[in-house]
């Protein structure tokens, strides 16, 4: 048994089964106040549809801010946002930093490699010390599933926590920006067929997307990938599972491609990247099997020639770069909702 950065033995998500779709540490809904308001954003799982729609509606208001000469609103003026990235992600950290800055917050990016956790201090000791510096909001990315929940349970009452990705478990703001992108282009969730393709087993994005899609009433969600890269429990969520890409893509309105997360794999689950592309890569020919107006999405980073062809990634049906743009507005909305009305 090992001791993790929390200072406790085992994993913060000790009851989680990495091969299953659901995680065992999700007991109750610690994200909501007694009045049903959003205090933390830890997972899309368990969020009422009304809150998800409220976030998307608020994000729509913030999209116009990016087009203004002065790209700032005073919603978080005087608030301190700490970006705590225990796992690297330049793209996600940067968009959170931009979002907080546009809300007029003071932003601190903690250099984890130089922090006390690398000197043996526990995660909770680090959080308690940062809370003593009058932080208002922690944006947390961690390699251990459940770490943001642990922080939310133990941080000071006035502090809010946003999960920026924890292990295989969840990436709620990516899921929300994906939903915003789909709504922007397709409007009505209740008439869509959405395909998620690739390494779903290791993907926190896939889990967040599936919870969001089912919450918003999408009638048909498809999971497409090799048997070795699909978790159990998908069918219980109402997801249709396909082990043939061509069959799975027929008639879909939205395609969400996922990269191979080799850093989370143990053992040889797949042949070479070239063989993977041959069987599972999205090419123009395969895209033609989808609905004529289908859109192509990808949470990034992309591996061209592995899960997606460059002609598709750069083609007219790709909305991948717009996902990045919308992501700033969605993260502004989340931060504004959880921390904007705090005393």
UniProtKB/Swiss-Prot annotation:
An example GO CC term for this entry is: cytosol
- Check the record and name the InterPro entries matching this protein: Asp/Orn_carbamoyltranf_P-bd, Asp/Orn_carbamoylTrfase, Asp/Orn_carbamoylTrfase_sf, Asp_carbamoyltransf, Asp_carbamoyltransf_Asp/Orn-bd
Which gene is annotated as encoding this protein in its UniProt record?
pyrB
Per UniProt, the ranges with Polar residues bias are 1-14
Q: Where does L-aspartate bind?
A: 119, 204, 259
GO terms in the biological process aspect are: 'de novo' pyrimidine nucleobase biosynthetic process; 'de novo' UMP biosynthetic process; amino acid metabolic process
SUPFAM superfamilies per record: Aspartate/ornithine carbamoyltransferase
- EC number(s) recorded for this UniProt protein: 2.1.3.2
Identify a single GO molecular function assigned to this protein: aspartate carbamoyltransferase activity
Asked if the keyword Transferase belongs to this entry, the reply reads yes
Subunit text? Heterododecamer (2C3:3R2) of six catalytic PyrB chains organized as two trimers (C3), and six regulatory PyrI chains organized as three dimers (R2).
Pathway field of the UniProt record reads: Pyrimidine metabolism; UMP biosynthesis via de novo pathway; (S)-dihydroorotate from bicarbonate: step 2/3
Q: Where does carbamoyl phosphate bind?
A: 91-92, 141, 171, 174, 300-301
User: Its catalytic activity?
Assistant: carbamoyl phosphate + L-aspartate = N-carbamoyl-L-aspartate + phosphate + H(+)
The protein's UniProt keywords, in alphabetical order, are: Pyrimidine biosynthesis, Transferase
Q: Name one Pfam family in it.
A: OTCace
Q: What does this protein do?
A: Catalyzes the condensation of carbamoyl phosphate and aspartate to form carbamoyl aspartate and inorganic phosphate, the committed step in the de novo pyrimidine nucleotide biosynthesis pathway.
Task: Tell me the protein's name.
Answer: Aspartate carbamoyltransferase catalytic subunit
Q: Which Gene3D superfamilies match?
A: Aspartate/ornithine carbamoyltransferase
Answer yes or no on keyword Heme. Answer: no
Species source reads: Burkholderia lata (strain ATCC 17760 / DSM 23089 / LMG 22485 / NCIMB 9086 / R18194 / 383)
**Member of which family?**
Belongs to the aspartate/ornithine carbamoyltransferase superfamily. ATCase family.
Top-down, what is the taxonomic lineage of the species of origin? Bacteria, Pseudomonadati, Pseudomonadota, Betaproteobacteria, Burkholderiales
- Chain segments carrying region Disordered: 1-20
């Amino acid at each position: 048994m090992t001791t993790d950065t929390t200072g406790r033995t085992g994993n913060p998500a000790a009851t989680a089964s990495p091969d299953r779709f659901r995680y065992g540490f999700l007991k109750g809904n610690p994200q909501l106040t007694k009045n049903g308001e959003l205090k933390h954003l830890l997972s899309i799982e368990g969020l009422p549809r009304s809150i998800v729609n409220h976030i998307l509606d608020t994000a729509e208001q913030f999209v116009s801010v990016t087009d203004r000469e002065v790209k700032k609103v005073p919603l978080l003026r005087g608030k301190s946002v700490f970006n705590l990235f225990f796992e690297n992600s330049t793209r996600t950290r940067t968009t959170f930093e931009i979002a907080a800055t546009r809300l007029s917050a003071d932003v601190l990016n903690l250099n984890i490699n130089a922090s006390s956790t690398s000197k043996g201090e526990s995660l909770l000791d680090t959080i308690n010390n940062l809370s003593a510096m009058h932080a208002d909001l922690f944006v947390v990315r961690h390699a251990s599933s459940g770490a943001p929940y642990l922080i939310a349970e133990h941080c000071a009452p006035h502090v809010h926590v946003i999960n920026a990705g924890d292990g295989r478990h969840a990436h709620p703001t990516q899921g929300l920006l994906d939903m915003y992108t789909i709504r922007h282009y397709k409007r009505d969730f209740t008439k869509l067929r959405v395909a998620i393709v690739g390494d779903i087993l290791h993907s926190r994005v896939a889990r967040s997307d599936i919870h969001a899609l089912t919450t918003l009433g999408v009638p048909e969600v498809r999971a497409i990938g090799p048997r070795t890269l699909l978790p159990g429990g998908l069918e219980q969520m109402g997801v249709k599972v396909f082990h043939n890409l061509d069959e799975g893509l027929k008639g879909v309105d939205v395609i969400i491609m996922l990269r191979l997360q080799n850093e989370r794999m143990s053992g040889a689950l797949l042949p070479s990247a070239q063989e993977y592309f041959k069987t599972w890569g999205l090419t123009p020919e395969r895209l033609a099997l989808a609905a004529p107006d289908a859109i192509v999405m990808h949470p990034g980073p992309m591996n061209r020639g592995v899960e997606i062809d460059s002609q598709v990634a750069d083609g007219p049906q790709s909305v991948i770069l717009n996902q990045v743009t919308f992501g700033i507005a969605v993260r502004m909305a989340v931060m504004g909702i959880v921390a904007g009305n705090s005393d």
